[in-house]
Amino acid sequence: MPGPQGGRGAATMSLGKLSPVGWVSSSQGKRRLTADMISHPLGDFRHTMHVGRGGDVFGDTSFLSNHGGSSGSTHRSPRSFLAKKLQLVRRVGAPPRRMASPPAPSPAPPAISPIIKNAISLPQLNQAAYDSLVVGKLSFDSSPTSSTDGHSSYGLDSGFCTISRLPRSEKPHDRDRDGSFPSEPGLRRSDSLLSFRLDLDLGPSLLSELLGVMSLPEAPAAETPAPAANPPAPTANPTGPAANPPATTANPPAPAANPSAPAATPTGPAANPPAPAASSTPHGHCPNGVTAGLGPVAEVKSSPVGGGPRGPAGPALGRHWGAGWDGGHHYPEMDARQERVEVLPQARASWESLDEEWRAPQAGSRTPVPSTVQANTFEFADAEEDDEVKV
């Protein structure tokens, strides 16, 4: 049948065309690479000729004739070609052999490599000391500096060196003694915390201020003269008011009747106003005018005119009268009785009446006595004393 036969022929033709492709590829893949498969030189400077490992040379070798070879015929034998190649190799290899001699010295490298300098360039206060420390004290390994060709390949000159660590036994004073590392007064090496000293001025403290305030009262007390050096100003009026209570009560111008009488009466309480200030300066003053002076009790003396006991104005008397008239305050009854027992043991009956007379002028007048009246009072007291001595 033509239909089936045509179909079979078409099938066989398709198989015949396709089958050789696969079979040939498998057989040709096993062949080895040969010199015939190498392409010819491409004409550029890299592919002018080819030289194999076994010495086979092929390609354009016209450049060999330009270097002194015979340029007779273009077809050369392999031997002549190998001879030319060997000559070329000798000519190319000769210059390296001539360069075996020591070449011109290269410029010397820096004294210290920048890498090494940056590695040890810590902040230093003294740059000169730092340079001397690096160059002088640090020991560099210079044993392999000399090589066979006479050029330094390792060490300080080449920029590569080994910095040895300083021993701990070497102290700063040893370096200072050598002179290579000058000493700096501001920097000191401390091996322990006990030798560390930090000087800081934080200003005056509260304790120092308190001590200064406490030392102020002691200084005036030391500068004040002794009580014995004071002039006996109170003794200008020998007739003490506390020592003569009957005379005060018997005198017509009593303090209660005339407030200004004590300043004019020689036997009045204000006859010796500066007595407390003169006698109580080394003892101190109180805010209310009371004198805090303590001293021996005044001796009682008899007066030929007044007929009563009379004694010098001592510290106790000055304290009593200074509190009664100068300060405008009076002693309590207990203090008055105590002084009465010590100074006037025989005038117990008239003491209470004397206290009542003292209290009257205190409520009426508190004005201090003028200085002029005090001066007149002292003069009057001196005149009265002279009159009493004459009688």
Curated annotation (Swiss-Prot):
Q: In which tissues is it expressed?
A: Endothelial and bone marrow stromal cells.
Q: Where is the composition biased (Basic and acidic residues)?
A: 167-179, 327-338
Keyword Disulfide bond attached:
no
Q: Which residues carry this modification: Omega-N-methylarginine?
A: R53
Q: Which residues are in the CRIB domain?
A: 38-52
Its recorded name reads Cdc42 effector protein 1
Show the PROSITE patterns listed in the entry: CRIB (PS50108)
Keywords, ordered alphabetically: Cytoplasm, Cytoskeleton, Membrane, Methylation, Phosphoprotein, Repeat
Subunit arrangement? Interacts with RHOQ and CDC42, in a GTP-dependent manner.
Q: What does this protein do?
A: Probably involved in the organization of the actin cytoskeleton. Induced membrane extensions in fibroblasts.
Q: What is known of its domains?
A: The CRIB domain mediates interaction with CDC42.
- What organism, scientifically named, is this protein from? Homo sapiens
> Which superkingdom, per the lineage?
Eukaryota
Residue spans of the sequence repeats: 220-226, 227-233, 234-240, 241-247, 248-254, 255-261, 262-268, 269-275
Query: What segment(s) does the record annotate as region 8 X 7 AA tandem repeats of [PT]-[AT]-A-[ENT]-[PT]-[PTS]-[AG]?
Result: 220-275
Please list the residue ranges that the record marks as compositionally biased, kind Low complexity. Answer: 236-270
**Where is the sequence biased in composition, kind Acidic residues?**
381-391
Biased composition of type Polar residues is found at 364-377
* Modified-residue entries (Phosphothreonine), positions: T34
At what positions is Phosphoserine found? 19, 27, 39, 65, 73, 77, 101, 113, 121, 139, 180, 190, 192, 195, 303, 350, 353
Gene Ontology terms: cellular component = adherens junction; cytoplasm; cytoskeleton; cytosol; endomembrane system; focal adhesion; plasma membrane
